[in-house]
Regions:
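Short N-terminal targeting/anchoring amphipathic segment
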Residues: 5, 67-87, 101-110
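N-terminal subdomain of nucleotide-sugar transferases
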Residues: 1-42, 71-73, 94, 98-101
């Protein structure tokens, strides 16, 4: 199968970027032809605020580049990962025009909550999921910015009104059952939500005997629960830390 993988990379490499690279390698190992279309948030520094806002709603550059890729590669399927802000919803419109089915992996909750991580003032927050975004805008939930929250909410509202989720995306991939329920509550069609967890490539068999302690894998930041890790760490007699970044 010929697969076009589309991903908007973050300014600082994170879990989503790692997952995309791992999936591309896995697909190629199984004989699929994969073309990776990526844009990088580092590009934003060259845009004016108006240009950045306009691009997040509809990117002419993305639309033109996808048309060229179709002429060269003619993919059977588009697998979209993060599309915010530079790839933009234009990828869905182009795919529909070219009659290419789209599978969308939802790595975070941005489609139902602009802040993307279901957090407000550092605490878990689901009250705005599935409702009109006026509360989100008032509370400035995205980067504590009224303008940026309003822009992101506008993008999501336009997608909903245009029927993007129902008409232009064939299937959504979520990471677990809880995510599936939250996205369904947020308005995504339940029959299009499929569960596929992330994976780690390893050729070692896990050894369960004589193990002690715990393992934390993630970015050392507040939203990842670093306070919980710290409180648990105090109970351990020994600890080891390894990481990148």
């Amino acid at each position: 199968m010929k697969i076009l993988v589309a991903h908007n990379r973050y300014l600082y490499r994170g879990g989503e970027d790692t997952v995309v690279d791992a999936e591309v390698n896995l697909l190629r190992q199984h004989g699929h032809q994969v073309w990776v279309y990526s844009r990088d948030n580092a590009e934003i520094q060259y845009l004016t605020p108006f240009e950045a806002a306009k691009t997040s709603l509809w990117s002419r550059q993305t639309a033109q580049e996808l048309q060229k890729i179709h002429q060269q590669f003619s993919p059977d399927l588009i697998h979209a990962h993060n599309t915010f802000p530079l790839i933009s919803p234009s990828i869905y419109g182009v795919a529909q025009k070219l009659r290419i089915p789209v599978v969308q992996t939802l790595h975070n909750f941005r489609l139902v909550y602009p802040q993307a991580m279901l957090l407000r003032e550092g605490k878990h927050w689901e009250a705005c999921v599935g409702k009109l975004p006026w509360r989100v805008v008032i509370h400035q939930c995205y980067r504590q910015s009224l303008s940026q929250t309003a822009l992101t909410s506008t993008m999501l509202t336009l997608q909903r009104l245009k029927g993007v989720w129902d008409k232009q995306i064939s299937l959504f991939i979520v990471l677990n059952q809880l995510c599936r329920e939250i996205f369904a509550r947020g308005g995504l069609p339940m029959d299009k939500l499929r569960i596929k967890p992330n994976f780690v490539e390893s050729h070692r068999e896990p050894q369960w005997q004589h193990r002690r302690g715990g393992l934390f894998i993630g970015r050392l930041s507040a939203e990842k629960g670093i306070d919980v890790l710290d409180s648990c760490d105090r109970c351990l007699l020994q600890r080891a830390t390894a990481g990148l970044g």
